[in-house]
Amino acid sequence: MLKHKILGLDVGSKTVGIAISDLMGWTAQGLDTLRINEEQDDLGIDQLVKIIKDNQVGTVVIGLPKNMNNSIGFRGEASIKYKEKLQESIPSIDIVMWDERLSTMAAERSLLEADVSRQKRKKVIDKMAAVFILQGYLDSIQ
């Protein structure tokens, strides 16, 4: 059993998908999708800090998009900056960057196989990607 819950984030330029673990550390469930505006530096950090405190989260896992050759591109740099902003706002929390290559594609495939409509997929894809990121992390620490 974990001492605290773990939050998983899929950070994009317009949304942040959020997933949360159970206290056993076995499963990740989709929690929410935050609307953000990266261009205007509106990153939803205050909302995220509230979610972290309300859910007694001790660790946050942020997806780190890498290129297939393991290099970090533009989206990866943006995720690292997001981590730094979050860490400034809540220094007591552990933040882990997790290789998220293909997590959004896996989430999309899973939703397609479940015959979810395009409109519904668009609403939940980031949350689903956060679930894939967090579940990968949880599986690695078992």
Curated annotation (Swiss-Prot):
InterPro entries on file: RNaseH-like_sf (IPR012337), YqgF (IPR005227), YqgF/RNaseH-like_dom (IPR006641), YqgF/RNaseH-like_dom_sf (IPR037027)
Location, primary (coarse class): cytoplasm
Single GO cellular component term: cytosol
UniProt record, GO biological process: rRNA 5'-end processing
SUPFAM superfamilies given in the database record: Ribonuclease H-like (SSF53098)
Main enzyme class: hydrolase
Coiled-coil regions listed in the entry: none
Catalytic activity, EC: 3.1.-.-
Alphabetized GO MF terms: nuclease activity
Record NCBIfam families: RNAse_H_YqgF
Functional summary from the UniProt entry: Could be a nuclease involved in processing of the 5'-end of pre-16S rRNA.
Name of the protein in question: Putative pre-16S rRNA nuclease
Organism, scientific name: Staphylococcus epidermidis (strain ATCC 35984 / DSM 28319 / BCRC 17069 / CCUG 31568 / BM 3577 / RP62A)
